[in-house]
Amino acid sequence: PPDVDSYIQDLLNTERVADLRPDEVVAALMLAENAIVADLGSGPGVFTIPLARQVSRGVVYAVDVEPRQLDALRGRVIDAELNNIVPVLASYTTPHLPPSHVDLILVVDTYRHLEDRANYFQRLRSMLRPGGRLAILEYKPGELPVGPPIVQKLPEGHRAEELRVAGYSLLRTFDMHEYHDFEVWVPSTNF
């Protein structure tokens, strides 16, 4: 967005954050203290900070393509007194994560913004450790009172099909959000 500063404020909007329920999402993911996590499309850190508190002996890679989002995150990390967050400037084709390194990749309200998603998520598989997971939180399809207009969202079933093509199987879904789908995927063994 052209006005990144106002976009950052929108992302940190108290009502939006409350609807996303970051603490509950992080708890549901049952991460070990020493887990290595990537928050893909981290923005100013709505999920990065709760993730970092959960994996207190691990690392959270805060991955974003917008440097000013990462600058906003750095300020919030200093305020939160956390030292296990690594900001990573990504490109639209790769998040720049090491191979076979990450236990969980969390993607919140970012999936629809990625280009060539099947190939992108196929590449992400190589960055997961054995047993690694991909968690996606994305606005539900159709007309909603909040979130992006319907023309910016994927049709029902489209994300699932893309992820299957990219080599993932749906592990489970959580029903804790009124306006978001919350899914956990794992690399398919027969891919």
Regions found by a protein language model. Name each.
Residues 38, 43-95:
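Class I SAM-dependent methyltransferase SAM/SAH-binding core
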Residues 135-160:
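Conserved class I S-adenosyl-L-methionine
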Residues 118-133:
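A short glycine-rich, Lys/Arg-flanked "PGG" loop and its adjoining helix->strand segment in the class I
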Residues 95-104:
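A short acidic, Gly/Pro-enriched loop at the edge of an enzyme's catalytic core
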Residues 31, 54-55, 128-129:
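A generic alpha-to-beta junction signature in SAM-dependent methyltransferases
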Residues 172-191:
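Core SAM-dependent methyltransferase catalytic element
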Residues 103-117:
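A short SAM/SAH-binding and catalytic strip from SAM-dependent methyltransferases
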Residues 1-32, 36:
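Class I SAM-dependent transferase core
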